[in-house]
A protein has these predicted regions:
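Generic beta-strand/beta-sheet core signal
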Residues: 88, 164-165, 195-197, 213-219, ...
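Extended low-complexity acidic/polar segments
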Residues: 77-82, 239-242, 311-334
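Divalent metal-binding segments
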Residues: 1-188, 194-199, 225-258, 262-275, ...
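His/Asp/Glu-enriched, well-ordered alpha-helical/loop segment
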Residues: 257-266, 274-276, 281-297, 308-311, ...
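Non-cysteine beta-strand/loop elements that form the S-adenosyl-L-methionine
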Residues: 16, 212-228, 318-328
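Phosphate/diphosphate-binding loops
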Residues: 181-214, 296-303, 339-360
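Acidic (Asp/Glu)-rich catalytic clusters
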Residues: 185-186, 205-209, 260-261, 288-292, ...
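Short alpha-helical functional segments enriched in proximate histidine and acidic residues
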Residues: 45, 153, 312, 407-408
């Protein structure tokens, strides 16, 4: 092979396939350098949208545009006054909506946490409600076409298996069923493993899925970009606070115990250290209640772990689907992270080498659509981490993107 090397197909161990498929087929504004540029992109998108009444754009970030803020409702109104539009933030945890969409949803979102009428920005539960509405406006035929296009795109980047977290607001969780059917329809060897995002174990059991979890309903906190990742110590900027922990320990532990006793594999979203600790406590409690040797439960993201939590993950064999693409991320730069949490905590982010040294199984995922599925980028970020104390070898990074990914869903012997 000369200077080339043959490797197994890569695995993306955490993505939102329905969302990525939709946004991949729509307007992506991640590369815009100003809100003025985003507005122009939206204007052109509207002009080419034909008879569509509801539009979606993705990738807005206040940290990669010269204005240093998100595009506003009023700015969207100027270029899209007659159609509903939702511009989703780069982290997938917030959005900005125009007045036409706000008028449609005001009765549902005005009293929810995260509602900001003046700017049109929706966070937390207000965002979830907007997402539910948009999701149910999608054509099923278009969704299937977009999924196939998204799979083809990922295959072109060497990805042969994805773990998709599903359950983003379709009535009756129909998207979970759609993704399961779509996965079975693939005839080229491509593999899809579906994680239903629910704290109701019956959602998985009734669909004969062996796993449960992800983000949305299984997210224990928010994210750094929206200032709602749950922190043990307060943020250091003027906004302060310690983020948002969506559930108390009792609810999370109860869910984990039920899912574990049902024989399901569990994964939960935890970005901040407070959420990470909660996830560790809950999984530990579940396994103490009903020990299982080969459960392969996991905590997604693990951006700001604690020593105590890492010890639990090591001792209880809890695996970690991480996103090395978050390292030195244009949409969420270190300068911003340091401004909200200080230098010491910023330097503790994404300690992949520490995870490896503790014998924890670490795999890589894109969290698409938050980042584009590209395993070469994952390897590059993990190996060439600017924080060299947490950089890993090429061989370690390659294993994270291949064997470990298959291990996560019990596929390592087959794939």
């Amino acid at each position: 092979l000369g200077k080339k090397v043959l490797v197994p197909a890569f695995v993306d161990t955490h993505q939102h396939m329905a969302s990525f498929s939709t946004f991949h087929a729509g307007l992506n504004v991640m590369d815009a350098e100003s809100n003025e540029e985003i507005a122009q992109m939206v204007k052109e998108f509207v002009q080419s949208s034909g008879n569509k009444k509801t539009l979606i754009a993705f990738g807005a970030s206040p940290y990669s545009v010269k204005e240093g803020r998100l595009i506003s409702r009023k700015e969207l109104d100027k270029v899209c006054p007659d159609k509903e539009i939702m511009v989703v933030k780069y982290d997938g945890h917030a959005c900005i909506i125009n007045s036409r969409l706000l008028d449609k949803l005001k009765g549902k979102v005005s009293k929810l946490r995260g509602y900001h009428e003046d700017t049109g920005e929706m966070n937390q539960e207000a965002f979830f409600e907007c997402s539910n509405y948009i999701t149910n406006s999608l054509s099923i035929i278009d969704l299937f076409k977009n999924m196939q296009s998204a799979i083809d795109f990922q295959a072109s980047h060497g990805i042969g298996c994805i773990h998709t977290v599903s359950g983003v607001g379709f009535t009756g969780n129909l998207d979970i069923t759609f993704e399961k059917i779509f996965a079975k329809s693939l005839t080229n060897g491509y593999q899809v493993r579906v994680f239903p995002q629910s704290m109701n174990v019956d959602v998985a059991l009734k669909r004969k899925l062996p796993r449960i979890g992800g983000c949305f309903e299984c997210a224990l906190d928010g994210c750094f970009g929206s200032h709602d990742a749950a922190m043990n110590e307060p943020y250091v900027d003027s906004l302060g606070g310690d983020g948002v922990l969506y559930y108390d320990d009792e609810k999370v532990i109860d869910f984990c115990k039920k899912a574990n006793r049902a024989g399901l594999q569990i994964e939960m979203h935890a970005i901040g250290d407070k959420a990470f600790d909660q996830a560790c406590r809950a999984l530990k409690a579940a396994l103490d209640d009903y020990p299982r040797k080969d459960h392969r439960h996991g905590i997604i993201h693990d951006c700001l772990p604690t020593e105590e939590g890492i010890k639990i993950c090591r001792d209880y064999n809890i695996q970690m689907p991480v996103q090395s693409a978050f390292i030195n991320w244009k949409q969420e730069p270190d300068e911003y992270l340091e401004s909200i949490m200080g230098k010491e905590r910023t330097e503790r982010l994404n300690p992949i080498r520490t995870f490896n040294e503790n014998g924890i199984v670490v795999s890589c995922g894109s969290d698409a659509p938050c980042t584009s599925p590209d395993p070469i980028v994952w390897i590059d970020k993990a190996v060439n981490n600017m924080n060299q104390s947490q950089a890993v070898s090429v061989q370690e990074a390659l294993r994270m993107c291949t064997y470990n990914g298959y291990y996560v869903t019990f596929d390592e012997k087959e794939r």
